[in-house]
């Protein structure tokens, strides 16, 4: 739901003339030592630490969305959130769950809709629910057997559209296929077009075969002007006839950018990767070099490549030793094509070929694009044809992941998902500007860097932790944000002064396991109608409320609760 991370401009300041009146009577200093350090590990009953927030409820996943025997099962990762009325829709790599939040202290399950295919990033507009599909196992019919064939008419990569007029019984009314699938998407409204909504699709998968989806091309633009590279898709959805949704255009918002260097991995990660690669090779595993480090390739990726080799020789059955040898010979080239696009004219390495996520602010005609190697500022006054007006890069950023505007659009915050989200990147040895937020001021089509913000509490090597999704809290006259940091928990911070962001509240749990990294933590934390709602990857759904402190008064909290979304 990153597209909804902005708070619409509302005239609420006048309702809160005394907002700051009581906070000075309460302590403002954070507890020392930090209670987040050294928390006891466990799955459902890990030790907890909270400061200036109260945990209202924790609701475990429904039975269809949990593997009791394997808490780290990636097939059941809880992902992003979307809201409508009293309901929250929680995406999951296995589908989505709808929870009734009428009683925040006890959310109740409305429906568990099984539909495998990551990430199931979700958004809602009135009675329509949109879900992103990118994984090769996603099927049009949402069944669970996957798609074993390399090319298949049964595969879904793109956007699923559901009618949730009866929210207990979502009805799939349309699927829009795209060439790179949909890792995330953003719903955009056009003030001049009330008959339609638009979806900006960010796909990060390799380009599909044209044998599976006609017209898909992975060639560079100088070889094929209709290349899918360096573009996003814009889908138009008729509100009266969503079944007619279609790709309207493919603006090349990344064209013309050149590759930028990022920092190397941390020394301990380089050493660990080398050790793991050596062990894998000794056991017959498959490895490849990515950004200077040898990595072990997963069985799913290897299996798909071997299947392709078998089919290319018109064979059947299991891959042979000859097939494995052929893959070893070709593997580095295959990985290079995925990770490093070929050089453009003149041998210049191009910049990123896709965006990860786009956050829109239609009221001011701007969007923030987080696009791997760059952060973009987009002009979206013409919603159907967004245009890049500024781009920033930073060698401290490994992967530009998401963006959040402040309320008046004078600032934008970008996150860096260094390590991809399932690695420990908040260790005491990790630099504070790596895997952090970068805050920029915005003026006259220019973004100017101001500072970094990173979760200040060090986490263990067994906790995946890095900057992830969050939203503004609508406190008048201030820029306050809540953000998920995976197993770093949630952090609430004040970035009203963009050069000096300050943490003012937090919640954290101990790791899932005290001996190894098991993925978990807050995928996203959003303010919604007076509460903070967090999607916990492995533990379910958390609901919090702010408590008055030396940083936020009760009057300010009450003013924020006056902002109500439907």
Task: Set out the residue ranges of the language-model regions.
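Feature marking well-ordered beta-strand scaffolds used for ligand recognition
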Residues: 19-566
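Bacterial N-terminal signal peptides
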Residues: 8-18
């Amino acid at each position: 739901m990153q597209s909804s991370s902005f708070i619409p401009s509302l005239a609420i300041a006048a309702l809160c003339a005394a907002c700051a009146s009581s906070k000075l009577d309460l302590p403002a200093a954070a507890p020392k030592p930090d209670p987040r350090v050294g928390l006891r590990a466990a799955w459902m009953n890990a030790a907890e630490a909270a400061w200036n927030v109260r945990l209202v409820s924790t609701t475990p996943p429904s039975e269809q969305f949990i593997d009791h025997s394997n808490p780290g099962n990636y097939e059941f990762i809880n992902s992003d959130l979307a809201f409508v009325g009293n309901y929250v829709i929680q995406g999951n790599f296995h589908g989505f769950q709808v929870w009734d939040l009428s009683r925040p202290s006890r959310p109740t399950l409305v429906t568990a809709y099984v539909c495998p295919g990551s990430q199931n990033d979700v958004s809602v507009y009135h009675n329509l629910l949109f879900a992103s599909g990118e994984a090769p196992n996603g099927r049009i019919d949402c069944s669970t057997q996957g798609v074993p064939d390399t090319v298949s008419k049964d595969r879904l990569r793109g956007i699923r559209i559901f009618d949730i007029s009866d929210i207990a019984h979502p009805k799939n009314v349309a699927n829009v296929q795209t060439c790179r699938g949909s890792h995330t998407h953003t719903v955009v409204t056009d003030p001049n077009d009330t008959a339609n909504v638009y979806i900006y699709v960010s796909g990060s998968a390799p380009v599909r075969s044209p044998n599976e989806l006609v017209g898909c091309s992975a060639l560079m633009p100088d070889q094929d002007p209709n290349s899918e590279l360096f573009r996003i898709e814009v889908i138009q959805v008729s509100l009266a006839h969503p079944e007619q949704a279609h790709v309207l255009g493919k603006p090349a918002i990344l064209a013309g950018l050149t590759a930028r260097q990022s920092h190397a991995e941390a020394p301990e990660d380089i050493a660990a990767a080398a050790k793991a690669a050596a062990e894998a090779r000794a056991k017959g595993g498959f490895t490849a070099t990515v950004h200077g480090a040898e990595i072990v390739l997963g069985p799913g990726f290897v299996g798909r490549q071997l299947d392709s080799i078998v089919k290319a020789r018109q064979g059947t059955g299991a891959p042979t030793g000859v097939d494995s040898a052929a893959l070893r010979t070709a593997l580095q080239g295959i990985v290079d094509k995925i990770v490093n696009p070929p050089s453009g004219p003149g041998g210049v390495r191009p910049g990123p070929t896709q965006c990860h996520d786009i956050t829109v602010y239609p009221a001011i005609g701007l969007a923030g694009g987080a696009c791997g190697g760059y952060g973009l500022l987009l002009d979206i006054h013409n919603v159907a044809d967004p245009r890049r007006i500024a781009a920033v890069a930073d060698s401290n950023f490994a992967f530009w992941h998401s963006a959040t505007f402040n309320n008046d659009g004078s600032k934008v915050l970008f996150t860096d998902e260094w390590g991809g989200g399932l690695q420990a990147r908040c260790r005491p040895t990790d630099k504070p500007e790596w895997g952090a937020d970068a805050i920029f001021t915005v003026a006259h089509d220019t973004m100017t860097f101001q500072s970094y913000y990173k979760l200040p509490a060090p986490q263990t090597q067994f906790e995946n932790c890095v900057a992830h999704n969050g939203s503004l809290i609508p406190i008048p006259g201030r820029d306050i944000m809540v953000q998920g940091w995976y197993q770093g928990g949630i952090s609430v911070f004040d970035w009203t002064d963009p050069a000096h962001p300050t943490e003012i509240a937090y919640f954290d749990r101990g790791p899932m396991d005290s001996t190894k990294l098991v993925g978990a933590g807050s995928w996203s934390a959003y303010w919604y109608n007076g509460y903070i709602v967090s999607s916990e990857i492995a533990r379910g759904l958390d609901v919090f409320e702010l408590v008055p402190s030396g940083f936020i008064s009760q009057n300010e909290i009450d003013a924020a609760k006056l902002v109500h979304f439907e």
